Structures are given as C-alpha cells and as structure tokens.
C-alpha cells in the first residue's frame, strides 16, 4: 500500500475502545484525546477541534447501546469543518449497525503501526479527493480526454486465488458491482492494468497471499488500492497487515458483516480512483495550457482562495512557490531562452511534487508550484538547486 509515515494534519484522536498510539513528538498530546464512550455516557457535545481520526471498536459498545451511540455520534461527525478518517474496528462475528459509512472497517487485531499508517494514507486520500473536486469545479473537464485503463470502467471487485469461494464474494458484493476472478498475482496485475478495480480480495493460502499482495503493491498504480486478505489462523492476521493488507478477514465471517467490510473497501477504492482520474486529467490540461501562455490569473486566484480556505479548515497552510528564473539566479537573454528555462523549472517541479500539488504556468506570473505542506517547498527548492547546479541552461 502507499508508504505514508506522517500525518497530513495533526489533532486529537476520538476513540471508543481502541486508542491509536502516537509515533511522533509533533502529534497532539494524549490528554487532548476524546473518549467517545465517556462523552456519550455524559450526553456531552464533542469538541469542535478537528480530530486526526475517529476510531470505534464495536466491541466497546454493548449491543443495545450501539444504535443510540451512533445516533449521537454521526451528526457530530457530519458537522465537523472537514471530513476526517473514521474507522470501525470489528471481528468476524460482530454485528454492525446499518447506515454507517466509515472510511474503512478493519479487523481489530490490526497492529498499532499499521493503524497509524492507514490513518496517514486515508488523510492524504481525503486531501486528494478535495483537490480533485476543487480542480473539477475551477478548471472544468477536458473535452475528449481519455482515461488510463486502470482508471476506466464500472465499479468492480477482483478476487485473487483458487479457494472456490468466488460465489460467496459475488453474494457479499452489492448488486451493481462486477466481480472478476484471477488465479494468481501475475494474472491480477495484468487484469488491473487493463481496467479499473475498486478493491481486491486475496483468498489464498498464507504464503501465496503474501506473494500476491507484494506483486500488486510493487506496481505504483495500485499502491493505494484497498486489498483485503483472507486467512484461517488468527496468528497470521498481523503478518498479513504488515505485508500490505488494508483489512484481514479471518475464519468464517457473518454474511452481513462481510458485506459491510467489502462495501466499505469498495466505496473508498472508487472514491480514490475517481480522484486519481481527475488529477491525471487536470495534469494533462495544465501541461497543455503552457502552449497557450499559461493559466489565467483569475482562474489561478480563484483556485488559490478556495484551496487555502479548504486547507485552513484542517489547520493547514498553503505554500506557493514562484518559480521565476531570477529567483534561482538565472537570467534569460531572450524570450525563447525564458521559455526553455520555464519549461525546465516546471518539469523539475512536476517530477518532485505530488499529484495533489498544483504545478503550472500562470500568465503574467510565470511558473508556480502550490504545495500542501512546508516540507514540500524545502524538498522542491533543494531539488531545483541540485539539478540547476549540474545543468547548462
């Protein structure tokens, strides 16, 4: 899965049962964490400060209290200034309330470091989704733009392995979801390169499952795809998580619970795929605009304002880097040379930045990079200086 080791935004954890552990001194102190069960018992309103994530272990709630608890919790989550990762931790036999739409439903045996990594992954995914929606709203669609095969198609689930439970996975999926089977990891990667899948289930013996997951995760196109692994022994759960599983299904799962977990993974996978598609589309469009003199100042200003407001709701700042040649000690002697230098600077910034960072040419401004964190500006500055030191422009 994505290698994410730092939070996109920091804050307290809201938790019921399982309390995520911290791994960085930069995290909010533990005494700011919110025990949801305690707040529910007191009938209190939750703080307005945006949490880093919300984690609810369903076993911490007595059966008869669950509906009341979620009736109290969900409206308060909805009223938060921005969406945050929301997790339900469960087991094979737990009964999950209907109507929940968490970011993910995960086996409660997930190791602490994997849970933290998933929080990091999902935080970034939410930022990418916000960025995709913003670009579509500000820049619109590109007429006739074709999508990459792994972004195209209807909502689909890929089942990898020869367990003989293919019909069970079809039965557990929503009616409109197409379920496709693959014998092994190589076949899975081949299928995934030709059409979109929103989630993968690996239903194979432990050693094969690890091998198949690693084949999938090695391909950068599928690093963020939800992958659910099936196992028979509880002692294998942690190993599968650490080898790339987004969730692990152990033993016989209650049919309704299995459907909840599968559909949650599919929902997140589809959302991520659509965001990837829009970001890829806008990337091509922004590159095309270079030949037309760049993005208009009015469009760019509207983007900056909307993006800044969205990040501020999460306590984040927007970092704009003007990439004019003079900022790097370069002097252009002609308009043709200036165009070449701008192209070089944009190419360096494009290769160094993330998909959710905006890199473009703006009319009257020149090349710019709009980054979502300060570390990105330092990294980009160093990269540009390093390349320019060894490049004759």
Task: Tell where the protein language model's regions lie, with residue ranges.
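Non-catalytic signal-transmission and effector/linker regions of two-component phosphorelay proteins
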Residues: 1-35, 40, 44-52, 75-82, ...
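Acidic, metal-coordinating helix/loop segments flanking the phosphotransfer/catalytic sites
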Residues: 34-53, 61-62, 183-199
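Short amphipathic alpha-helix used as the core "switch/output" element in two-component signaling
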Residues: 63-82, 210-223
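Alpha4 helix (beta4-alpha4-beta5 surface) of REC/receiver domains from two-component response regulators
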Residues: 66-72, 91-105, 211, 232-248
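Receiver (REC) domain switch/output surface
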Residues: 101-102, 113-143, 257-272, 278, ...
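Catalytic-site or vestigial catalytic-site microsegments of nucleotide-handling domains
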Residues: 163, 298, 302, 313-336, ...
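Short regulatory alpha-helical coupling segments
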Residues: 290-317, 347-351
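Conserved helix-loop-beta segment at the catalytic/binding core of cyclic-nucleotide signaling proteins
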Residues: 327-329, 342-377
